[in-house]
Amino acid sequence: MSSIDKKELEKFEKISHNWWNKDGEFGILHRINPIRLEYIIEKITTHYNRHLSKLTYREELVGNMQHSTAAYALVREDASSRLTHKLPLEAEFEKMSNDISKLEILDVGCGGGLIATPLAAQGFNVTAIDALQSNIETATAYAKENGVKINYLQSTIEELDSDKLYDVVICLEVIEHVENVQQFILNLVKHIKPNGMAIISTINRTKKAYILGIIVAEYILGWVPKNTHDYSKFLKPLEIYEMLTDTKIEIKELKGLVYDPAKNEWKLSDDIDVNYFMCLGRKSMCYPS
């Protein structure tokens, strides 16, 4: 059973060259990317008990492409000096006591690589897949230009080797764009190792999400192109919980992502009425908070 929505593919293929243009159609993803990356790394390092200094990401312009391109430089806060040391994307990042390169990450629906490429630059072993060849070409070119080693594949989750398991499966802002969403999610979790985890993000199906995520974001502020989202495809956390009932996977954490207009910034929140992250793991495992 395919998860491909052909209309969605056609829509994204038209703008697939523009993933790394921070002022283009994917500009909103560039604005939320630092907090997304920080959250993902925090959850991975906590889950696998990696002892890291506080990690955040800062956006900076790099490259000399036709459009402005954005990469994310690691900012390592030294707990003793409280000084910030910025490392360029191309740098060989410090290896931790537990080598993170041994952690295999699968990014499903990677688009142009806004999440996968920075994670690979951090040192994780990343495989990233997308149904659109044009997305993979954009992602591969950007990673190559910035000296980042990563395995990009044109593939759907259904086409991926079913026997291959990963320490972390990531799927951000994707499930609201697919067909047969329950089967898609079941295929996602099949690729989680017994001690592994998954991180999903999507949009809740609430009146608040309709107003902010569609009317405001698409038609008033123009943060994303009109008709990017279909309200009927938004998912309530309870619906995902029910989809996982007959699996060995359960929801370990829900965390909201909200916009603070007073500070003009995005931040994590307990408010999951619109955008939210969901961490998944085996039912037998306790997930550290």
From Swiss-Prot:
Pathway: Cofactor biosynthesis; ubiquinone biosynthesis. This is Ubiquinone biosynthesis O-methyltransferase. Residues 50-98 form the RPE1 insert domain. S-adenosyl-L-methionine binds at residues 36, 109, 130, 172. Belongs to the methyltransferase superfamily. UbiG/COQ3 family. Pfam families: Methyltransf_23. It is an enzyme of class 2 (transferase). The keyword Oxidoreductase does not apply. InterPro entries: RPE1, SAM-dependent_MTases_sf, UbiG_MeTrfase. GO terms for biological process: methylation. Keywords: Methyltransferase, S-adenosyl-L-methionine, Transferase, Ubiquinone biosynthesis. GO terms for molecular function: 2-polyprenyl-6-hydroxyphenol methylase activity; 3-demethylubiquinol 3-O-methyltransferase activity; polyprenyldihydroxybenzoate methyltransferase activity. HAMAP family: UbiG. Its EC number is 2.1.1.222, 2.1.1.64.
